Amino acid sequence: LRCLVGSEMCIRDRVEPLTNEEALAEGYTIIKSASDLQAIQNDLDGKYILMDNIDLSGVSWNVIGSLNNAFTGELNGNGYAISNLYINSGDDYQGLFGYMEGAKISNLAVDGANVVGRRYVGGVAGYSYDSEIYNCYSTGVISGYSDIGGFIGYSTHYSSIASSYSKADVVAQEYRAGGLVGCNTDNSTITDSLSHGDVEGNLNIGGLAGENAG
């Protein structure tokens, strides 16, 4: 069993990693390298699984999914980590994924991320619409102008974060900064999850959500 571990905490749910053969039988596309991971942008509705830790040190990351072309697929981290994600942008929708709609991210660590954007900035995704994060953790520093979160910048329309943990430090120059999500709204939920990073901003700041609008 591989347990997703932050610096201080083991996520409650444990992962029994799938083998290559099992993953292929379940219809997954195998991800083993940074180039494999970046290639997700060529099929945003695909079903993907990590088969190794991926170090993005030195990689000029192109955010996967945008407002007009969202990531709608699935990424199963399989208990592995994506480390050293680096983004320094003045644009909205920044993170490993920029914009997710109807997507699912599970069993994944985003470790040591350094993400800078404008609005809708997160370690995992900038914007989540009707999407799910389950059994994940994040560490690093996430910063921008507004709607900044350790996992998700803006989580809306029945999106969910469950059984997850963030130790990312979050900094908003203005408003809505949260340890897990900057703004949680429109029937979106956070369950069995916690954060243990520093959160800074001028207005609407929270350990889990900067603003929880229901």
Please state what every model-predicted region is:
Residues 7, 12-214:
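Surface-exposed repetitive/solenoidal architectures
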